[in-house]
Amino acid sequence: MYRLLAMKRFFIKYMVAVLLIMVAAKAIAQPKAVQDSLAKANTLYATGEYDKAAQLYEAILLKGFESKELYYNLGNACYKSNQITKSIINYERALKLSPKDEDALYNLAIAKKMIVDNIETLPEPGFLRWWKDMIAALTTDQWATRSVVAFLFFLGLFGLFLFTTKAGIKKLSFWFSLLFLVYSIFTFSFASSQKSRLTGSDKAVITERSLSVKGSPSETGTELFIIHEGLTVQITDQLGEWIEIRIADGNKGWVKENSMVKI
């Protein structure tokens, strides 16, 4: 009886955690007014009025609505109106929501050819790249759904293990329940990772025309190197108004927070 009560409490806590992740990740349905604004912005873009289209896309974002398509369209409008840095920011935001989107990846690569800095990227370890790709293969909701389904299978099989008297079934149900539990835990962690990636800000785009990167979080810090507008950097630490960044070649330093836009 005690084991059943403990399982029930564990199940409730687990389901609440999974549902919270799913609710937090669920996109807000677009009301008709937003759909109309989006259609108008798309029409403006199609007729070559890129500045007006960009303004309308931004107005939709200010209302609290976002999607990969919206950021991608805004990136295109900014690029067409020669706002290269803003186009990079929005392509990066589109890729944050959909890391494998080929159109956004291609257009981002084109936009980055227009900026001053061309920094060679350090190769990422194969296993780490594979791990990130695996997590990014599904959305937060999809991972969370798999976690719930696997956990339900675990409960059913573990219940069978507890109550069956047949040795063969008892053994099989135990090992299969363990397998589903492990899968459920992994998929839950993948859902959590996806949620953290979507809600966190560990990347930024430099908005200063030319920026001195310091060796310490101070105006009097030693100048390490110079970077320029449009460069995407990794945020590694923050101390007040100073942010420690890492660029693609691995070099690190400190810059002011107001010199960048977080992704």
Give short role names for the model-derived ranges.
Residues 120-162:
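Membrane-embedded alpha-helical segments of integral membrane proteins
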Residues 170-194:
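Internal/C-terminal transmembrane anchor helices
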